[in-house]
């Protein structure tokens, strides 16, 4: 915890470069004791500094409430907590809405990823499934808690190596959202307002 607080500029002595986000804190489907220890330290550091937390969830599991319970116990503000990899649980409407009701951000960050995950025996949700789920979340009143991202984590995901690169959401997914009736004002909330809220309040 002390090291995290130092890196975030919350100690007396300051590092040359300040971190502005805690994470992505990794949680596996086994949710090991070491992972819980790391998560608790992140929660304490966030409580001490006000810096937001981003948590890697194993998307096909349902560990979001356990994660939020731990962060809450450590004093973290759930309104500055981002739960990553929410795409695979898109059809579990109750789960996602309950997490949003607790204040957390739901990050749909597997957009444009048409991968088969052998360890999960599961296919990534399609862009159409993602768009419909996001539209339903908006219709249910959760627009201010949705984040969009691509989770670019492989070399082959860069345009230079044949991937979608970093512009896929703007070039391809935003037009799809428009086709689902999402307005320009709503898109501004998703693309600009919500990222600001993660950091600002």
Task: Identify the residue ranges that each predicted region occupies.
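Divalent metal-coordination and catalytic microenvironments
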Residues: 46, 106, 151, 187, ...
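Distinct, well-ordered alpha-helical segments
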Residues: 33-36, 60-75, 92-100
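Glycine-enriched alpha-helix->loop->beta-strand junction motifs that scaffold or abut catalytic
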Residues: 49-52, 72-79, 98-107, 144
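Short acidic/histidine-rich active-site segments
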Residues: 141-163, 187
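Active-site glycine- and acidic-residue-rich loops that bind
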Residues: 83-93, 112-135
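Active-site gating/metal-coordination segments in enzymes
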Residues: 1-52, 105, 111
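Catalytic beta/alpha-barrel core
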Residues: 52-59, 80-88
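Mid-to-C-terminal alpha-helical segments outside catalytic/metal-binding sites
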Residues: 168-201
């Amino acid at each position: 915890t002390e090291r995290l607080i130092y890196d975030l500029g919350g100690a007396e002595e300051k590092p040359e470069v300040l971190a502005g986000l805690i994470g992505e804190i990794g949680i596996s489907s086994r949710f090991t004791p070491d992972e819980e220890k790391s998560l608790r330290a992140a929660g304490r550091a966030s409580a001490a500094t006000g810096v937001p937390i981003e948590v890697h969830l194993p998307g096909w599991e349902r560990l979001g409430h356990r994660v939020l319970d731990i962060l809450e116990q450590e004093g973290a503000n759930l309104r500055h907590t981002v739960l990553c990899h929410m795409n695979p649980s898109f059809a579990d409407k109750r789960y996602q809405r309950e997490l949003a009701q607790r204040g957390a951000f739901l990050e749909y960050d597997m957009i444009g990823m048409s991968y088969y995950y052998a360890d999960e025996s599961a296919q990534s949700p399609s862009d159409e499934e993602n768009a419909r789920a996001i539209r339903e979340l908006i219709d249910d009143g959760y627009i201010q808690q949705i984040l969009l991202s691509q989770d670019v984590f492989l070399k082959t995901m860069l345009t230079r190596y044949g991937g979608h690169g970093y512009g896929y959401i703007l070039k391809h997914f935003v037009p799809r959202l428009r086709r689902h009736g999402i307005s320009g004002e709503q898109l501004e909330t998703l693309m600009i307002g919500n990222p600001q809220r993660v950091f600002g309040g």
